Amino acid sequence: MPWLQVRLAITPEQAETYEDALLEVGAVSVTFMDAEDQPIFEPDLGTTPLWSRTHLLALFEADTDETALLAHLALLTGGELPEHHIEEIADQDWERSWMDNFQPMRFGRRLWIVPSWHAAPEPDAVNLLLDPGLAFGTGTHPTTALCLEWLDGQELAGRQVLDFGCGSGILAIAALLLGAERAVGTDIDPQALEASRDNASRNGIEPARFPVYLPADLPRQQADVLVANILAGPLVSLAPQLTGLVRPGGLLALSGILAEQAEEVREAYSAHFDLDPTAEREGWLRISGRRRAD
């Protein structure tokens, strides 16, 4: 069945008004999209940011009366409609289309992230099974990719790893598949902990090798390797805590950092770590290093 799609060019201030109005006139879905390829890197806590120029897409049943729809929408919003476009779009298997667009990804020499419905391109490689669509990290974001590539380049055999802000558990699970003896994950979101457990099970990892905790319950023991893919602000404020969680001689990898934030993050860790050159991908950075002996 085809659909009628209405596209409106709006500002953030208009978003709620037009979203409510579109739903009231019968939209079966409403989606916000970036109209000008404007990135939003680190929004303030408690905010739901939108782009300065946003496209609002609404889908209606194909037999919807376009003239009546626009007239009713203008009445509800109290004035002339912004720039808009209406077109008929064909129905399709949206789930299949989404699945076809997600292919296995390689990180470093050995590691692949492979969706569960796809055959591993290199069966003898280190293949981590993980599906896209989670809110917690699937390897597609540059910060996750930076951390995965770093892990692939380390000698992890027999190491104890801490994934701070574990999300989907992708980094800890990758470390275990790459040879780490044990990994611990921590996250402020209970749903992230559940996602980590599920993904570990999917990859054949026993719960004892990858326990996960809320921060308040995290055992105070030092790790051989700590990875933290969060954001620059928390990385700076948590520097004393994260430093204390890495044993002398242990390794640290931090991401979620923009270029203009790198100096502050490096300064927060330079007193205790010999830091490597900064790595960059698509505007995001990774800072890594080795903790000096006390």
UniProtKB/Swiss-Prot annotation:
One of its GO terms (cellular component) is cytosol. InterPro entries: Ribosomal_L11_MeTrfase_PrmA (IPR050078), Ribosomal_PrmA_MeTrfase (IPR004498), SAM-dependent_MTases_sf (IPR029063). One of its GO terms (biological process) is methylation. It is found in: Cytoplasm. Gene3D superfamilies: Vaccinia Virus protein VP39. Its EC number is 2.1.1.-. Pfam families: PrmA. It comes from the Bacteria. S-adenosyl-L-methionine binds at residues 144, 165, 187, 229. One of its GO terms (molecular function) is protein-lysine N-methyltransferase activity. Keywords: Cytoplasm, Methyltransferase, S-adenosyl-L-methionine, Transferase. Methylates ribosomal protein L11. NCBIfam families: prmA (TIGR00406). This is Ribosomal protein L11 methyltransferase. It comes from Pseudomonas paraeruginosa (strain DSM 24068 / PA7) (Pseudomonas aeruginosa (strain PA7)). The gene is prmA.
